[in-house]
Amino acid sequence: MILGCIADDFTGATDLAALLVRAGVPVSLRIGLPERPGIGPSDGVEVVALKIRSVPAEQAVTQALAALDWLRAGGARHIYWKYCSTFDSTARGNIGPVAEALMGRLRARQTLYVPAF
C-alpha cells in the first residue's frame, strides 16, 4: 500500500476515505484495530478508524501504535495521522502524545501538524 492512515474516530476516517475515493484512489476502511493482515489494494490506501479521540493519552498511544504496526506490516510506505481538528476532546489532550509516539516508532525527526482537513 502507498499510504496507511490512522484516524482518531470513525467520522474522520470516513471523511478521509471518501475524499480519497473521490480522487480515484483505491481505499480500504478498517473499523477498529484490524486482527488479520490487510487485503486492501497494493497501490492504494488503508484507513484504520480508531475510537481514541476522547480516551486517556496512554490508551490512545497504545492503540495508535498497534494500528501503525499493522499498517507497516502490510507495507505502508507513508503514514498519515488524522486527528480531530477541534482539539477539544479531552482536558489534557492526546493528539501530541500520539503524534510523538508515532514519530518515535517511525524514527521521524520532524512532522507537520495541520489542524484542518
Where are these regions (language model features)?
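Non-transmembrane, aqueous-exposed alpha-helical and coiled segments at domain scale
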Residues: 1-117
